[in-house]
């Protein structure tokens, strides 16, 4: 690795925007990789270093470049829940169907973690598929219930997903719906939301993932 590429990686990791600009001006490659195959843009996203990320996007950095764990800058926005970073990457044309190592799109980890602002923004500002199913057989709706804490943030995430058209009858790979998971976990508020959504949808529409 040449010294300019190393400086760019270090600057992106630290969020040093001036150093990012200087490294690029000196000839550093926007798609250079560290030992874990992380690009400068991915390092900036992981640290939520917005200005550094914006400079890298302007230099043509790829929001879909995966690292050794199949994480990419775009996918990581769903993990961190950073709405401002999500918006910074949109001009770069992220692949909304890109999957992480679990087969999930960015919406799914955001729903799991209760990132209300991110879920609201990505549903409103992109064409992300609300009922995408990962390799575990879970949609964002299922994951919010199965791995969430049942509190107010996850209730709001479920409301947003349902309002965006999430199918409350979609079951996991074992045939269990989000409503049934909510009941099993003792999440009364989520169970009420999901039962009402099933009622509105008109009967048992379960067709599987």
For the regions a language model picked out, list residue spans one by one.
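Intrinsically disordered, low-complexity regulatory segments in ankyrin-centric signaling systems
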Residues: 1-26, 35-38, 54, 120, ...
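Ankyrin repeat structural motif
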Residues: 16-24, 49-57, 82-90, 115-124, ...
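Ankyrin-repeat inter-repeat connecting loop/turn
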Residues: 30, 63, 96, 129-130, ...
């Amino acid at each position: 690795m040449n010294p300019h590429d190393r400086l760019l990686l270090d600057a992106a990791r630290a969020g040093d925007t001036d150093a990012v600009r200087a490294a690029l001006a000196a000839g550093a490659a926007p798609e250079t990789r560290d030992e874990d195959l992380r690009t400068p843009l991915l390092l900036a996203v992981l640290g939520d270093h917005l200005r550094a990320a914006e400079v890298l996007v302007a230099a043509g950095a790829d929001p879909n470049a995966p690292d050794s764990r199949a994480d990419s800058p775009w996918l990581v926005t769903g993990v961190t829940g950073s709405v401002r970073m999500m918006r910074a990457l949109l001009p770069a044309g992220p692949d909304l169907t890109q999957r992480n190592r679990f087969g999930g799109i960015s919406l799914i980890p955001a729903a799991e973690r209760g990132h209300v602002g991110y879920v609201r923004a990505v549903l409103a500002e992109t064409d992300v598929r609300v009922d995408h199913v990962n390799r575990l057989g879970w949609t964002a709706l299922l994951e919010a219930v199965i791995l969430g804490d049942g509190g107010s943030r996850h209730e709001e995430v479920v409301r947003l997903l349902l309002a965006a058209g999430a199918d409350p009858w979609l079951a996991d790979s074992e045939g269990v719906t989000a409503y049934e998971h909510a009941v099993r976990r003792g999440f009364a508020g989520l169970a009420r939301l999901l039962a009402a959504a099933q009622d509105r949808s008109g009967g048992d529409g379960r067709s599987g993932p």
